[in-house]
Swiss-Prot record:
The lineage of its organism: Bacteria, Bacillati, Bacillota, Clostridia, Eubacteriales. It catalyses: a quinone + NADH + 5 H(+)(in) = a quinol + NAD(+) + 4 H(+)(out). One of its GO terms (cellular component) is plasma membrane. Belongs to the complex I 49 kDa subunit family. Coiled coil: none annotated. It is found in: Cell membrane. The keyword GTP-binding does not apply. InterPro entries: NADH_Q_OxRdtase_suD, NADH_UbQ_OxRdtase_49kDa_CS, NDH1_su_D/H, NiFe-Hase_large. This is NADH-quinone oxidoreductase subunit D. NDH-1 shuttles electrons from NADH, via FMN and iron-sulfur (Fe-S) centers, to quinones in the respiratory chain. The immediate electron acceptor for the enzyme in this species is believed to be a menaquinone. Couples the redox reaction to proton translocation (for every two electrons transferred, four hydrogen ions are translocated across the cytoplasmic membrane), and thus conserves the redox energy in a proton gradient.
Length: 366
């Protein structure tokens, strides 16, 4: 008697807590082993790029908040950076420093969600509670400076919307001084946990060559040992004035991808501290017309967001509205290698591998 075996098709999502949003993976399984994984994004597609063609250049800014809604400040920055390049606008120094402070706070907030949610994915809910407790302080700081917590719409073409309010610097300094202690707690709760290490170490190892071939960026790339951070290799704004290190992994496995984010939070705190010490007095916005009409042309600019390289391509026809806006979304690009990363691993590992990439569906689907 012969036993017939066949591959099994399983839909993971779109409504599944570990997909961090409405995201579906069609898994082909041989027993419990993944043979093939097809990501099916698009459930949160809102047609943002098309909508922007009928908005003025300033009206575009709130839409960028809704890309990576866990790092709204950085999404704002990526867009205004491209328009400023097109218009050849010189940004006041004070505005540049404010951008760095809120941008790095946004990076820390995003990484706090990534590390806490990753622990919860693997079964350790306690770490999630601790990281969200500390992220709340950043949300309060954003509310102080912009009036909003999650969708700040804080950046403006030529600078920022508001100057630093009273009490902000003191509260921000208190937070960055406290952060190293918080990270020690995360290391105790999450990093040093034997079960967490067993689920993440040597799982879904990614080589530097493959990461470069697939145009991966951010912590996913640097976990493979590739020393590529735009703030260092192609400094924008005033980043060349700050001393900080670029944390790198050695194996490129799930653990490295997780741990890189913890180390990056420490470096972001260093940058914020230096920016607060060095910030000059002066205007917070360049003198540009109220009605923004960039010259006919195109520009592409990139920033280092929390997920990787966020690029914005803007085409101007000389009117008050962009002819075309396109975003290079790092989560979307990083997700392109998911099939290769999942192949050969057990279904239980799928959650650990997907969580290590740290995707945000607002940015993936746009």
């Amino acid at each position: 008697m012969t036993i017939k075996t066949e591959e099994f098709l399983l839909n993971l999502g779109p409504q599944h807590p570990s997909t961090h949003g409405v995201f579906r993976i069609v898994l082909t399984l041989d027993g419990e082993t993944v043979v093939k994984a097809v990501p099916v994004p698009g459930y949160l597609h809102r047609g943002i790029e098309k909508l922007l063609e009928s908005r003025t250049y300033t009206q575009v800014i709130p839409y960028t908040d809704r890309l990576d809604y866990l790092a709204g400040m950085l999404m704002n920055w990526g867009y205004v950076h491209a328009v400023e390049k097109l218009m050849e606008v010189e940004i006041p120094e004070r505005a540049e420093y404010i951008r760095v402070i809120v941008g790095e706070l946004s990076r820390i907030a995003s990484h706090l969600v990534a590390t806490g949610a990753y622990a919860a994915d693997i079964g350790g809910l306690t770490g999630f509670i601790y990281t969200f407790r500390d992220r709340e302080e950043i949300m309060d700081l954003f509310e102080m400076i912009s009036g909003a917590r999650l969708t700040p719409s804080f950046m403006r073409i030529g600078g920022v919307a508001y100057d630093i309010p009273d009490g902000f610097m003191e509260r921000c300094k208190k937070f960055v001084d406290y952060l190293p202690e918080a990270i020690k707690e995360y290391n105790t709760l999450i990093t040093g946990n034997e079960i967490f290490q067993a689920r993440t170490k040597n799982v879904a190892i990614l080589s530097a060559e493959k990461a470069i071939d697939m145009s991966l960026s951010g912590p996913v790339l640097r976990a493979t040992g590739v020393n590529y951070d735009l703030r260092k290799v192609r400094p924008y704004s005033v980043y060349e004035r700050f001393e900080f290190e670029v944390p790198l992994g050695t194996k490129g496995d799930c653990f490295d991808r997780y741990y890189i984010r913890l180390l990056e939070m420490e470096q972001s705190a260093r940058i914020i501290q230096q920016a607060m010490d060095q910030i000059p007095e002066g205007p917070i916005r360049a003198k540009i017309p109220k009605m923004i009409k960039p010259p006919v042309g195109e520009a592409y600019a990139e920033i280092e967001s929390s997920k990787g390289i966020m690029g914005t391509y803007v085409v101007s026809d000389g009117s008050t509205k962009p002819y075309r806006v396109h975003f290079r979304r790092p989560s979307f690009v990083n997700l392109g290698y998911l099939n290769e990363m999942l192949r050969g691993w057990k279904i239980a590992d799928v959650i650990a591998i997907l969580g290590s990439i740290d995707i945000v569906l607002g940015e993936v689907d746009a």
